[in-house]
Amino acid sequence: MKINRLKKYYLQTIVPKLIEQFAYKNQMQVPRLEKIVINRGIGDASQNAKVLESSLKELTIIAGQKGIITRSKKAIAGFKLRQNLPVGVCVTLRGERMYSFLDRLINLALPRIRDFRGMSVESFDGQGNYSLGVEEQLMFPEIVYDKIEQITGMDISIVTSSKTNDEAHALLKEFGMPFKAKGNKN
């Protein structure tokens, strides 16, 4: 079985660096990636099934794994939403697909964003997980501009086993995530 380039880099390079940096006594204490969740909410999904289908297809192409359709849990009259109507699509990546997606995100997709200055350090949630929002799916090289129905963004949550934001920041920085400098707010 072929091991992913990023996973190999994690095992051979990142783990020893983090053991030294945080003075872990055991290799199992080193934080690791648990899963990556890609979520896309679609407001028109209840009225237009074609938008939902194309969005699910795009997310499947981006993630390399078939997504699921998320449905509303309760009715909200202000949004013209009934219970159990489709409202979005979601994919949870683990294992090799997770490392493959993170590799493509860091090395191919993020550099293609116009006026990209780095990822915000404030997007950690306090338990060592990182979330980022993407404004358009065109940053992924797998998506062909002529075949998209509608330009929509998505939320990407990177779940780690770390207990603090500092550990998760060090882990993602070692993976190559381009963070802004701490003092830089732009």
From Swiss-Prot:
GO terms for biological process: translation. Its main location: plastid. One of its GO terms (molecular function) is structural constituent of ribosome. It comes from the Eukaryota. Part of the 50S ribosomal subunit; contacts the 5S rRNA. Binds 5S rRNA, forms part of the central protuberance of the 50S subunit. This is Large ribosomal subunit protein uL5c.
